[in-house]
Amino acid sequence: MGLVVVGLALLDISLWWLVLDYFIEEADATHKAVMITTTMLTFGMGASTQALFARVGGGIFTKAADVGADLVGKVEAGIPEDDPRNPATIADNVGDNVGDVAGMGADLYESYCGSVLATAALGAAAFIASPELQFNAILAPMLIAALGVILSLLGIFLVKTKEGATQLQLLRSLDRGINTSSVLIVVASFIVIHLLGLSYWICGSVITGLLTGIVIGKATEYYTSHAYRPTQDIAGSAETGPATVIIKGIGTGMISTAIPVITIVVGIILAYLFAAEMDMGNMSMGLYGVGIAAVGMLSTLGI
């Protein structure tokens, strides 16, 4: 699903750019670029609106179908879960596809499109005084995202495990693919920035985004995998009854948000400073760096 999401996102963005470039008439090339990029932001708003309904509505339908099927099947009829004799199993399977495939795909699609489109708009505004660099700044996030798709293909082929592998081994295999693609994307970003004539400081923002994504992924893995202590502690709390499981689970869930929040804040500050060349007053370049960091973070989305 990851490759479908990023492929459709880049295809849609490219097509809309060509359409708007044909229909928008503006004598000044720099102002035309600003018009196109700001107009394309509405594309991201539409994707976000659709993702809201698909993700939230799909999640509610998924859980309702799941609980309903279990109540009828296990409690009332006494048959196993997902048994074909239970008609509610059909709704349960449909709900899994709606919530876990359509909803998640729409969510990732709008995040991916939003990062690329916002960065392009910020680039158009930051380099409005230089037509050549302005177009290159608009092109940079799209090229980084496109190279990320290609390099993600290589990472996918590195995700291999043996039969009967444990969950920890599966996670290590996935890490191998993501880490390899991330390193290659850093190298590719340096080449892209060099060819486009932009400041090498922007590469620091790309690296910041990639590292931020990796840290958030590791934190999520630590707090949700049964191979690590937090989940094991929640399971162990069941020895004293369901109340302690709920309390321990809520507490662990609250603590687990600390690392991602702190990482995102630090990542935003570093990405801003790198692109602004350590000048806090250079807001236009700093915001462009934050956008580039978001593109870098999502460049491995195909995996």
Model-found features: residue ranges?
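Hydrophobic packing and interface segments
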Residues: 1-303
